């Protein structure tokens, strides 16, 4: 069955339907990863987006039980050049098509994904609609241009109540702004005693758990849409070691007086080189973000840039000069992608132990 993708600029792409038949709208973005589509589909950071995979053949190893990053997906659509109909992998239990149908996610295949990607690179991310051929592109484009982005995406994907993931090591409070399970898995590997809190937890609630450290997770949307989190971060700075990832990095920067802005088309993929300015080493990282901390806004703050993206020079890591806190824009847990940056979790635990030695950590 033929379906189409209509963009807000009036352009449209006709392809083959797979997955759900429902009509959908969202921000059309692209991901440059060759693999990891299951983790991408289940990453809450993609809430409200229609994801285009630049690699031409997707679905080769099917869908398994183990590689999900959240209980349910939040993507609004999935676009590929070719969707594999006969996957081959010993763990695979569903085809990509079967999974999308089960979760109600519309898919589109057979379009020129290279042309679509170049369009996004040239003009920036665009609002789009996956729909039937009976929809008029001109009328749909006008509706898309008038459509406003939702501002409550973090609320949609965050846990509604606190829950534990017990361990015998350091107690970590993990703030869930749309947390990937990969972050929790990395903390569990290190035997951390984790308490997951919702995005709107107050500083008093966070400190009430008497944590050894606080982690700020990834999540979707504009960091300025989560003012309560910015206030919470200000309330805990200096009282407990802090480590932020992706959206958590941006919220930390805002809490410290810096600014963020929307990128033209963002960083999404598992092959982004990042340079550590302290060591000169380069790591290949997994990334998924459409906003960035602006260099010029760091002047006058007590933040130091620790990492930059080699492709465009944007800020990829920050460290506070006065308190035990650091953040990165990329995903050290990978899931999917390379694990070059995985030692950052160990760096966080080392920071906690150093903080404890000084007798500064808050306990009951």
UniProtKB/Swiss-Prot annotation:
Q: Which GO terms describe its molecular function?
A: ATP binding; carbamoyl-phosphate synthase (glutamine-hydrolyzing) activity; glutaminase activity
Origin species, per record, is Bacillus caldolyticus
Q: Which SMART domains does the UniProt record give?
A: CPSase_sm_chain
Catalytic reactions on record:
hydrogencarbonate + L-glutamine + 2 ATP + H2O = carbamoyl phosphate + L-glutamate + 2 ADP + phosphate + 2 H(+)
Job description of the protein: Small subunit of the glutamine-dependent carbamoyl phosphate synthetase (CPSase). CPSase catalyzes the formation of carbamoyl phosphate from the ammonia moiety of glutamine, carbonate, and phosphate donated by ATP, constituting the first step of 2 biosynthetic pathways, one leading to arginine and/or urea and the other to pyrimidine nucleotides. The small subunit (glutamine amidotransferase) binds and cleaves glutamine to supply the large subunit with the substrate ammonia.
Task: Kindly give the PANTHER family that the UniProt entry links to this protein.
Answer: CARBAMOYL-PHOSPHATE SYNTHASE SMALL CHAIN (PTHR43418:SF7), MULTIFUNCTIONAL TRYPTOPHAN BIOSYNTHESIS PROTEIN-RELATED (PTHR43418)
Q: Which InterPro entries match?
A: Anth_synth/Amidotransfase (IPR050472), CarbamoylP_synth_ssu (IPR006274), CarbamoylP_synth_ssu_N (IPR002474), CarbP_synth_ssu_N_sf (IPR036480), Class_I_gatase-like (IPR029062), CPSase_GATase1 (IPR035686), GATASE (IPR017926)
Look up the EC number in the record and give it.
Answer: 6.3.5.5
Q: Which residues form the Glutamine amidotransferase type-1 domain?
A: 171-358
Region feature CPSase, mapped onto this chain: 1-167, 1-171
Does the keyword Signal belong to this entry? no
Regions that span the bilayer: none
Which enzyme type, at the first EC level?
ligase
Active site annotation, chain numbering? 246, 331, 333
Q: Which Pfam families match?
A: CPSase_sm_chain, GATase
Q: Which family does it belong to?
A: Belongs to the CarA family.
User: What protein does this entry describe?
Assistant: Carbamoyl phosphate synthase small chain
Q: Which HAMAP family match?
A: CPSase_S_chain (MF_01209)
Record pathway: Amino-acid biosynthesis; L-arginine biosynthesis; carbamoyl phosphate from bicarbonate: step 1/1; Pyrimidine metabolism; UMP biosynthesis via de novo pathway; (S)-dihydroorotate from bicarbonate: step 1/3
Oligomeric state and interaction partners are given as: Composed of two chains; the small (or glutamine) chain promotes the hydrolysis of glutamine to ammonia, which is used by the large (or ammonia) chain to synthesize carbamoyl phosphate. Tetramer of heterodimers (alpha,beta)4.
Recorded name of the encoding gene: carA
């Amino acid at each position: 069955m033929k379906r189409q993708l209509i963009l807000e600029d009036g352009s449209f792409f006709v392809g083959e339907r797979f997955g759900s038949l429902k009509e959908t709208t969202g921000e059309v973005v692209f991901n440059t990863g060759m693999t990891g589509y299951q983790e991408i589909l289940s990453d809450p950071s993609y809430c409200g987006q229609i994801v285009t995979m630049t690699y031409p053949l997707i679905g080769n190893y099917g869908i398994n039980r183990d590689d999900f990053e959240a209980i349910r997906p939040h993507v609004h659509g999935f676009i590929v050049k070719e969707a594999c109909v006969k996957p081959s992998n010993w763990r695979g239990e569903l085809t990509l098509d079967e999974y999308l149908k089960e979760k109600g996610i519309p898919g589109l295949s057979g379009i020129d994904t290279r042309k679509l990607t170049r369009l996004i690179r040239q003009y920036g991310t665009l609002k789009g609609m996956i729909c039937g051929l009976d929809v008029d592109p001109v009328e749909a484009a006008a509706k898309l241009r008038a459509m406003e982005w939702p501002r409550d995406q973090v609320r949609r994907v965050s846990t509604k109540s606190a829950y534990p993931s017990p361990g015998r090591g350091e107690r970590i409070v993990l703030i869930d702004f749309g947390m990937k399970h990969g972050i929790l898995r990395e903390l569990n590997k290190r035997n951390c005693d984790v308490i997951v809190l919702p995005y709107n937890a107050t500083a008093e609630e966070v400190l009430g758990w008497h944590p050894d450290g606080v982690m700020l997770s990834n999540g979707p949307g504009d960091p300025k849409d989560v003012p309560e989190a910015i206030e919470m971060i200000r309330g805990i700075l200096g009282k407990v070691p802090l480590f932020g990832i992706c959206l958590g990095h941006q919220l930390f920067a805002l809490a410290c007086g810096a600014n963020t802005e929307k990128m033209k088309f963002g960083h999404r993929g598992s092959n982004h080189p990042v340079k550590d300015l302290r060591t000169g080493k380069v790591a290949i990282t997994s990334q998924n973000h459409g906003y960035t901390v602006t260099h010029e806004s760091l002047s006058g703050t007590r933040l130091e840039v620790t990492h930059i993206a080699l492709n465009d020079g944007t800020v990829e890591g920050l460290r506070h000069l006065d308190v035990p806190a650091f953040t990165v824009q990329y995903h050290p847990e990978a899931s999917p992608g390379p694990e070059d940056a995985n030692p950052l979790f160990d760096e966080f635990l080392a920071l906690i132990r150093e903080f404890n030695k000084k007798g500064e950590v808050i306990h009951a």
